[in-house]
């Protein structure tokens, strides 16, 4: 861990630490797992479980959206100065395919890094 107590380490170490930190949170309860976490790229996975599905057996869009929000938020966090916080201002998704089983993967890279906002 860095001196300021943050999770800023190697991308793999940061992902391991983030996986510990999300235990007991919404992302952790859903079963998300970070695989890479850096200021330039974030990757995470979610193994589809029955409780992630809508009544018709398809992965719920809210689970997909939560995974997307989580990786984007983690990327924004990795670019903050110590003591700063981040929240999602806007989030949009187009779901163009159905998933019934397996593992979904999300990756985020920065499109814009500004002082008040960033786009991932």
Residue spans of the language-model regions?
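Terminal targeting signals and extreme-terminal segments of soluble enzymes
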Residues: 1-120
